[in-house]
A protein has these predicted regions:
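Active-site anion-handling motifs in enzyme catalytic cores
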Residues: 1-183
């Protein structure tokens, strides 16, 4: 068979090859392909005054997610929550954190705030972080599973593993020099 199967990270490529699939190529996630050196050169290196964040309803960690949101409140002037998934809002409500601006759960709403405001993205939704980078906004993805973590290993997309969430204030306050390596 001369057809190739595209995968988004080296981990998946090696795993499939170990199972005997030799027609595999790591092309990274197609959503990253436009993140060229020229594109990312327009992304601010320093922290914005405002932030939009996401949570993931199927990857709950009440303690660490509460710490994340409170750290965002401590380090940004305005904090916005964008519920991407169907049950993200109910999860956010269970955290019982006040003082958060809640956005409508639609992609156009998320895109609008990224385009119109000087704002950072921090959150557990991988592709929300990639969307922020596509729209030339500073982003820090909180890695809750191997997808974001493995993609970061290959590409350099900024990811902080949730188990290290205590490092969030340092990560958001330091200058972020993006050096991406998209296959």
């Amino acid at each position: 068979n001369n057809m190739l199967h595209s995968v988004r990270d080296e981990y998946t490529e090696k795993k499939l090859i170990s199972y005997g699939f030799n027609n595999v190529i790591n092309t990274s996630c197609p959503t990253t392909w436009e993140l060229t050196e020229e594109h990312i050169s327009d992304i601010d290196h320093s922290k914005s005054k405002d932030v939009v964040f996401t949570l993931t309803d199927y990857g709950k960690n009440y303690e660490k997610d509460t710490l994340m949101v409170n750290d965002l409140k401590d380090n940004y002037r305005n904090v916005y929550f964008w519920p991407q998934g169907l049950h993200d809002m109910s999860y956010f409500n269970k955290l019982a954190i006040n003082g958060i601006n809640v956005l409508a759960p639609s992609l156009p709403t998320f895109e609008k705030i990224l385009i119109e405001e000087n704002i950072d993205y921090v959150g557990t939704r991988l592709h929300a972080g990639i969307k922020a980078l596509q729209l030339k906004r500073r982003a820090l993805i909180i890695g809750i599973d191997n997808r974001a973590i493995e993609l970061s290993k290959d590409t350099g997309i900024p990811v902080l593993e949730r188990e290290n969430i205590h490092n969030l204030p340092d990560m958001i306050n330091k200058l972020q020099q993006l050096e991406l390596h998209i296959p």
